[in-house]
Amino acid sequence: MKGFSRRRFLQASGSLVAIPAATSFLFSGCSLQGGTLKIAHNVRLTSWDPTTGLSSLDATAQSFYKAVFDSLITQHPDLSLSPGIVTDWGWSNDGSKIHLSLREDAFWHDGSQVTPDDVVWSLERAGSLTSDNPMRFIWSKITNFSISGNTVIADVKEYEPAIFKLMAYLTSYVLPKKAYTALGAEAWEKNPIGSGPYMLEKFEKNRFIRLKSFPQYWGPKPDFETVVIKMLPDAMDRVAELDSGDCDLAVNVPYEAFNRLSSSSKWEGQAYPIADVGMIFITNKEATMKDKNIRLAMHHAIDKQRLIDELLLGFGRPIDSMQVPGYDAYDPSIEIDFDPARARSYLSKAGYSKTNPVKLSIQTTRGYRPKDYEMIEMIVDMWREVGVEANIEVYSRTEHLKLRAQHKLAPAAFFNWSNSIGDPFS
């Protein structure tokens, strides 16, 4: 198994983009072993607790978390599972219990050993009714823990077929019981302790993270001794870092800049599609959005291929469901085509037309994903052609997550959605 390389920083990040392909650049002279790797990243980390709060649901923050912490189970880019902190797992014959066997060579960054008690405490904390863990509806199904040697055994209230996949997913990290309870939540943010390949050396909120290789890490030695992550939400700031030579690696590079930089021998560009979906969340805040005819009209009015060709310069692929190629539930027969005439017909059934349009608001980020705002501008123009008038409101990534948690999004809201385990229920 390879160490925690610059490629794994990309693959773990989830920051790789919605609908379009992921883009990144690596300085061609950057050593793949030892030294310091400097990354220009598009996300500002808001918390060092990977199991609670809004940031724990942010797929783009997972590269930071996976560098410092360990999930119960490890997942590879091809979605396969392999041992992490837990080396063996399974169900009882009747499907009422699970067992998790902990590796004996895992240590916390303070030098203490990772124990089965840490695993039990982490799962109990995650599933507590008072927990801020957004996945507690899953973790609360696991109860009545017992420990036998290095194995944790627990009851499962109801059969959850994806339980082990979820242990490689969001909020599934193991934290040190003794250290966390001694520090408390506030002090933890200044001195988080994990068991991952890197230790936190310095953190300046909204500015940068400096990580140092952990010599007692149970897995392969990381490729770099030190990693510095500059948090730069503005895409042009990341491009400027590349142009000035102040970083070795940048993610979520705008496509025009990608093509320009790719022509230089100084940089190695990578662009590839990933399972991070650009989507418009639809709410039922207004009566019009409860009408299926209106929702279908809005969908059939969008020319996805045109968005990809004209805005994304061909970097991306259209999809028609939340399941993407490679997921177990992917069904290629599901198609919702671009058909303006059909869209007008649906609107007519709902009592609307170009002269009597549906009116609504749509929220979008601006610069969080390449061409996110421009994409919504083009979609709004497409809607206008069939009889939907949409007013664009700009919000930040953090504002979206807060509004979504409070069920206060606008009737339509653009953001990315990612589910790396491919579970349809999740």
Listing of model-derived features with the role each one plays in the protein:
Residues 186, 214-260, 389:
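Ligand-site clamp/hinge motif
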Residues 87-132, 153-155, 241, 288-290:
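Aromatic- and charge-enriched surface segment that lines or borders ligand/interaction sites
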Residues 39, 362, 384-426:
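Periplasmic binding protein-like
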Residues 210-213, 290-381, 385:
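Append "and occasionally in soluble cytosolic enzymes with long acidic Gly/Pro-rich linkers
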Residues 41-93, 124, 193-194:
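N-terminal lobe/hinge region of extracytoplasmic solute-binding protein
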Residues 90, 97, 101, 136-179:
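Surface-exposed binding/hinge segments that line
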Residues 8-29:
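N-terminal export signals
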Residues 66, 76-80, 168-222, 226, ...:
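Gly/Pro-rich hinge or "lid" segments in bacterial periplasmic/extracellular proteins
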